[in-house]
A protein has these predicted regions:
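Positively biased amphipathic helices and basic secretion/translocation or surface-docking motifs
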Residues: 11-42
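Conserved beta/loop motifs at nucleotide-recognition and modification sites
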Residues: 50
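N-terminal amphipathic alpha-helical interaction or autoinhibitory segments
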Residues: 1-10
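Prokaryotic Sec-type signal peptides and long signal-anchor helices
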Residues: 9, 19, 53-56
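A residue-level detector for the "anchor" residue at the start of short, highly conserved motifs
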Residues: 30, 35, 39-44, 54-341
Length: 341
């Protein structure tokens, strides 16, 4: 078995070089190769990108091992959000088209997300009036602000925003994770307030991750330039750089591979030598499940690979079982993980 896995790794590494930014194409190539070689013992599970030690490979074990116990079907997340306007009215929104009208503005929702449209009234809404878009566990949503800035919001995230921007800055407030594609306006910097810190840009694409339970603010820059400013320090980021502010107030900057940090907005999970405990934090938000580790050793197992976020939860857990030599039991929306003995 080790020899067969090794040969698959070698092929996967070659494909990764050839199709570095197209894992789906690489998977199809690997699938055709395996069919020609007629390796019967292993099947390919579409959507699972797996690294075994040194290289990437699309792999799924077609085993008779039934250690994964499912008592219910776990569905992936979907487009859904709760919009709370400043007047206290609450709207539950999703893919269905709808139009919400305020005294001065319109909020249009369709399959592409939420779009803010300014009205033509003589007395526009005060720019000090902020509304709230909340994304629950198992949800995601996209919105376009009044200035044309697009925002992708991940599960368990909140964005405070005005229906219209005014003054010298375009300011929003974020909790959780979001990707911003900021409309260019040199005269009016775009500012994202996160806890006691702020990120200032003119026109750029960047990701911000700030969940209270994680104890850090991670800003990853895709294009343009941003300035991250904490209470005590500040850094300027260039494309391919990331700032991390920890709970002790320490601010650091480093160069990173950007894609794993922004792949979620394109419907993918991408992992690069990540601890299983950290992976399950992301997975639990998207699939809206609880996770319980029965031993500390399982938390430290590292994985590299990826899959589509809309793939089945069972496929993901079987992949983790196979690679990590662990047992997973799912009961009452809770995943129990233990090191295989």
């Amino acid at each position: 078995m080790a020899d067969k896995l090794g040969s698959s790794e070698t092929l996967a590494e070659r494909l990764q070089q050839q199709y570095r930014y197209d894992p789906v194409r690489a998977y199809r190539k690997l699938k055709n190769y395996r069919r020609r070689r007629r390796i019967r013992r292993y099947g390919v599970a579409a959507g699972i990108l797996l690294v075994l030690g040194l290289g990437w490979g699309w792999f799924h074990q077609n085993s008779t091992d039934d250690s994964l116990l499912l008592t219910q079907t776990i569905q992936p997340g979907s487009k859904k959000a709760v919009l709370t306007l400043a007047d206290g009215s609450v709207w539950h929104i999703g893919d269905s088209a709808m139009l919400i009208s305020t005294a001065q503005n319109h909020i249009r929702i369709d399959s592409s997300g939420m779009l803010l449209q300014a009205g033509k009234e003589e007395k526009p809404e005060s720019t000090d009036t902020y509304h709230l878009l909340s994304i629950p566990r198992g949800g995601e949503f996209t919105m376009t602000l009044a200035d044309g800035t697009r925002v992708w919001l991940n599960s368990e995230s909140e964005l405070h925003f005005p229906l219209q921007f005014g003054g010298k800055q375009r300011k929003v407030q974020l909790t959780g994770e979001a990707y911003f594609e900021v409309a260019k306006d040199a005269a009016h910097p775009f500012v994202v307030e996160v806890c006691d810190s702020k990120i200032q840009v003119l026109g750029t694409g960047f990701n911000v991750r700030s969940y209270s339970e994680e104890g850090q603010i991670v800003t990853t820059l895709v294009e343009g330039t941003v300035c991250f400013e904490s209470i005590e320090d500040r850094v300027i980021l260039k494309p391919g750089e990331q700032s991390i502010l920890d709970k002790e107030g320490r601010l650091q900057k480093r160069a990173v591979e950007v894609y794993p940090f922004v792949a979620w907005k394109e419907g993918r999970f991408i992992f690069r030598k990540q601890r299983l405990e950290d992976i399950m934090v992301m997975v639990s938000r998207w699939y809206n499940v609880e996770v319980y580790f029965e031993d500390d050793e399982s938390k430290e197992i590292t994985f590299s690979g990826g899959m589509m976020r809309n793939d089945g939860f069972e496929a993901l857990m079987k992949m983790i079982e196979t690679v990590g030599s662990i047992n997973c039991t799912i009961k009452d929306n809770t995943v129990f993980i233990a090191k295989r003995k």
